[in-house]
Amino acid sequence: MLATVGIGVQGVAKLLVTVVVGRVFGTETLGQTTALLSLSVFVALLWPNAAGNTASRFLAIALRGRRSDAAVNRLLGVSMLVSSVVLAAVTVPIALAWGNGPGMVLGGAAVVVGYGLYCYARGAQLGYDRAPRVALWDSVTSVLALGLLVVACVARLEPFVLLPLAIGYTVFAIACWPRGNGFPPASHEPAAGVLGFAAWNVLAVVTSNGLLQLTMISAQVTSSAHDAGVYAAAFTLATPASMLGQALGQVLVPAFAHRTDGGSLRSRGALLLVVGFAAASAVVFGLVALLAGWFLPIVYPAEGAAAVADLRYLMVAVWVFTVGLVPAALLLAAGRSRQVALASVAGFVVGAGLMAVLGPVAGVAGGTTGFLVGSAVNLVAVVGLGVRRRSRSAIPDSID
């Protein structure tokens, strides 16, 4: 529960950042900022997010088995540092191609590094069952980021509006970086399966979570700067809702790491969890869509009225996407990252293909349509995996 609160605080902080940016610096800057944030989240899926999920599972197993996790920490830590440099370097030419100035490019690269380290450190702390620590530092760094944003706005430092978030994420990573579980290291600490699990997890999280970020990136690429800014107003209010499923997924991976049912939805508890979450989130998301015409113009006076239809359509797609994260997390907890990845590929390919085809023709609605259809395919695929009887001889994708 505390971990969910923590990620909710971070989501609210990110929302407030975009609201302030939109109000102070205008529609086009809002679009650029939101697109760069989506890019940072997307590239984090290419390793840091998967490394965090891997740390969450393997550190939890080592802790409960009273074994040292030094080898796992060392392996994942080095991989994180290398990937941070590579992903930041990849971000720079993309940000420049979108017409951003040096300050925004620097901020975008800094967010890529900071957010990636944040994802890894957060997953590791949840593996240690330290949800209170995670919630504390989520809150502290959110306040820090908002305070620094106020300074940037007062000083009219428009090119550097992303740096406050980058600093907040980096401070969290430093404070929560995994430093071991305290058990004495053995002469040989097995880390077999760690990178293999993480590699399949990359494919799993990209194909299941990547479409959401590609929706905003598609708007930035296929629409005018003004239309992308209007869509960003809807996107920034829709994405915090998806964090419910992401937060629950991060909690489920370590909590269910020792279950022997392979993430099956045939068990009563797992089925009730998925159905209950789907029903509860439908109520929440439905209220957001229903009240959009009232609160959007208040939050974004310049863009709100024009973004109402975009938000309502997005909420349908985000709900389908969010529900699919829960059965996927149960499968990941059982070590079935390979199956989740392969099951999600079809949805990602269909969704991304529709974005590419419909984006230039239908504008921002084309991106949302691709996201909705791709998420629906993913949901059907992971539910099918969870319901299907698993062979007794099947083994997890990694060895503890």
Task: Locate the predicted segments by residue.
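Signature of the first transmembrane helix
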Residues: 1-49, 199-225, 348, 352, ...
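Interfacial segments at transmembrane-helix termini and the short loops linking adjacent helices
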Residues: 27, 94-108, 290-322
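Interfacial transmembrane-helix starts/ends
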Residues: 34, 64-81, 195, 263-279, ...
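Transmembrane helix-bundle signature of multi-pass secondary active exporters and lipid flippases
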Residues: 37-45, 231-250, 284, 314-321
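Helix-loop junctions and terminal segments of transmembrane helices
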Residues: 45-64, 234-262, 332-333
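Hydrophobic alpha-helical transmembrane segments
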Residues: 105-109, 114, 135-183, 348-350, ...
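Membrane-interface junctions at transmembrane-helix termini in multi-pass inner-membrane proteins
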Residues: 114-136, 316-343
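Interhelical loop/hinge segments that connect adjacent transmembrane helices in multipass membrane
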Residues: 132-137, 158-210, 261-265, 390-400
